[in-house]
């Protein structure tokens, strides 16, 4: 089941800001939520550390437990390092591609745009946030959706990071994204240790 509660509170639980909005709040209150959040946490077991890292990864990409487990199983079948393959698959989810390109303010907004039918891949509407975009494919905003405020903002680069992921070729003006390569781990700005997640599932 996916988490649907307050994202700032979730960021504090995870120990990292999970949305742009959470960044400024997290700087003020980086400790966990609740009455005892400021207290130093007790030392934790190796299992608890791995589980916590798995949860952070799951929350960051807005996945259910079942979805993340499936990503791990898929990654095991690929020839590369399992953790790096997990990150690559997560980055090629349609929702993540929209986020990385600056077409959405958060992964949650990206999911909503896709669910509401605003996004196409190679000219065909795709309404599945987990859809795996392949190198060479073109992601676009549907023509009739381009007059909506979120996409006017996207065209102006409101949500774009200073440095767009190098495996994407993005035109904010045209509201198009070309996936030019499969992401490499060093190109992905996520503050996680994916090896701990692999160890969690391999236990």
Curated annotation (Swiss-Prot):
Keywords, ordered alphabetically: Ribonucleoprotein, Ribosomal protein, RNA-binding, rRNA-binding
GO terms of molecular function: rRNA binding; structural constituent of ribosome
Keyword flag RNA-binding: yes
Domain S4 RNA-binding residues, every copy: 92-152
GO biological process: ribosomal small subunit biogenesis; translation
Transcription among keywords: no
Gene Ontology annotations for the cellular component aspect, listed alphabetically: small ribosomal subunit
Function: One of the primary rRNA binding proteins, it binds directly to 16S rRNA where it nucleates assembly of the body of the 30S subunit. With S5 and S12 plays an important role in translational accuracy.
UniProt family annotation: Belongs to the universal ribosomal protein uS4 family.
Subunit-structure text: Part of the 30S ribosomal subunit. Contacts protein S5. The interaction surface between S4 and S5 is involved in control of translational fidelity.
Protein known as: Small ribosomal subunit protein uS4
Organism: Thermobifida fusca (strain YX)
């Amino acid at each position: 089941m996916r988490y649907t509660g307050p994202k700032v509170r979730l960021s504090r639980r995870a120990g990292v800001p999970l949305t742009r909005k959470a960044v400024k709040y997290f700087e003020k209150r980086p400790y966990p939520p609740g009455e005892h959040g400021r207290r130093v946490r007790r030392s934790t077991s190796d299992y608890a550390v791995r589980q916590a890292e798995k949860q952070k990864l799951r929350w960051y990409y807005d996945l259910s437990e079942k979805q993340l487990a499936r990503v791990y199983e898929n990654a095991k079948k690929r020839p590369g390092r399992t953790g790096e393959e997990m990150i690559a698959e997560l980055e090629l989810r349609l929702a993540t591609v929209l986020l990385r390109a600056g077409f959405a303010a958060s992964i949650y907004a990206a999911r909503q745009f896709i669910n509401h039918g605003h996004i196409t891949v190679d000219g065909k509407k795709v309404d599945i946030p987990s859809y795996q975009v392949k190198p060479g494919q073109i992601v676009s905003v549907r023509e009739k959706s381009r007059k909506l405020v979120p996409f006017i903002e996207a065209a102006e680069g409101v949500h774009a990071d200073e440095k767009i992921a190098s495996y994407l070729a993005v035109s904010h003006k045209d509201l198009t994204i070309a996936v030019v390569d499969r992401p490499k781990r060093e190109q992905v700005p996520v503050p996680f240790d994916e090896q701990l997640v692999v160890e969690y599932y391999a236990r």
